[in-house]
């Protein structure tokens, strides 16, 4: 007999400076993912715009701002652009492995390099090895660390050039956090490749969506998500197709991923 479903208790954080939009404040509503129903709860909350961080599911709940918009790629209809096709070909030799969610020194070293290059002043800049281990290993759901390695003769472990902490949900893959070698001279577009690879693998597995988190109006750091089509956004009336404006498309073209 299955355990009875317990309706979760939700809490709201105190206002804090927004890490994405200068001069704004943010609040989050959150709940704990625990017990036998953690997977079902995470799936249900994911469909209404929540994200997972360790054993907590959260979403923005800002009083005077609605810039954060949940977005997901429709995997079976994914139509890569010409530049995305080139990126897929360029990196198609990478060896992809879905690893158990155990943090390694090699992954952490890659993360430190990525943060120093792309987000030196971001909220994760001071993340130490224990913080990283907590991010990866404290999961009550079906999570994997997807590793991207360069091929080597003989089939051994090649150089690690990319990672993505990924949850498998009932209706798709949720990309929790990805990082990669941002200075590899021969691997341009690794961030784009990791997302596109997730979308193609989801489609092959019969999973309809890949959840990318929040597209944030006015944030250049999140503009790249608009490059993956077709894209759906979550609004007051549910999920609908997201058609970026011409200016948003231009911003997406130039933001690195």
Swiss-Prot record:
Its EC number is 2.3.2.29. The keyword Iron does not apply. It is found in: Cytoplasm. It comes from the Bacteria. It is an enzyme of class 2 (transferase). SUPFAM superfamilies: Acyl-CoA N-acyltransferases (Nat). GO terms for cellular component: cytoplasm. GO terms for biological process: ubiquitin-dependent protein catabolic process via the N-end rule pathway. The keyword Transferase applies. It holds the Pfam family ATE_C. It catalyses: N-terminal L-glutamyl-[protein] + L-leucyl-tRNA(Leu) = N-terminal L-leucyl-L-glutamyl-[protein] + tRNA(Leu) + H(+); N-terminal L-aspartyl-[protein] + L-leucyl-tRNA(Leu) = N-terminal L-leucyl-L-aspartyl-[protein] + tRNA(Leu) + H(+). Keywords: Acyltransferase, Cytoplasm, Transferase. GO terms for molecular function: arginyl-tRNA--protein transferase activity; leucyl-tRNA--protein transferase activity. Belongs to the R-transferase family. Bpt subfamily. PANTHER family: ARGININE-TRNA-PROTEIN TRANSFERASE 1, ARGINYL-TRNA--PROTEIN TRANSFERASE 1. Functions in the N-end rule pathway of protein degradation where it conjugates Leu from its aminoacyl-tRNA to the N-termini of proteins containing an N-terminal aspartate or glutamate. This is Aspartate/glutamate leucyltransferase. It comes from Sphingopyxis alaskensis (strain DSM 13593 / LMG 18877 / RB2256) (Sphingomonas alaskensis).
């Amino acid at each position: 007999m299955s355990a009875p479903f317990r309706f979760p208790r939700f809490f709201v954080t105190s206002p804090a400076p927004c890490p994405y939009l200068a001069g704004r404040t943010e609040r989050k509503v959150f709940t704990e993912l625990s017990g036998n129903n953690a997977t079902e709860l995470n799936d249900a909350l994911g469909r209404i715009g929540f994200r997972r961080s360790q054993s907590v599911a959260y979403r923005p709940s800002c009083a005077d701002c609605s810039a954060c918009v949940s977005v997901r790629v429709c995997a079976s209809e994914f139509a890569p652009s010409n530049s995305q096709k080139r990126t897929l070909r360029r990196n198609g030799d990478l060896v992809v492995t879905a690893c158990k969610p155990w943090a390694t020194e090699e992954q952490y070293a890659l993360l430190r390099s990525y943060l120093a290059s792309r987000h030196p002043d971001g909220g994760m800049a001071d993340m130490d090895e224990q913080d990283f281990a907590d991010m990866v290993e404290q999961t009550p759901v079906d999570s994997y660390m997807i590793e991207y390695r360069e091929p080597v003769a003989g089939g051994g472990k090649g150089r690690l050039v990319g990672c993505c902490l990924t949850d498998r949900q009932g209706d798709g893959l949720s990309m929790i956090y990805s990082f990669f070698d941002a200075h590899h001279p021969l691997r341009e577009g690794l961030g784009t490749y990791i997302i596109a690879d997730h979308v193609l693998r989801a489609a092959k597995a019969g999973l309809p969506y890949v959840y990318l988190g929040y597209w944030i109006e006015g944030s250049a750091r999140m503009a790249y998500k608009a490059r993956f089509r077709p894209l759906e956004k979550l609004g007051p009336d549910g999920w609908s197709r997201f058609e970026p404006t011409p200016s948003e498309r231009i911003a997406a073209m130039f933001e690195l991923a």
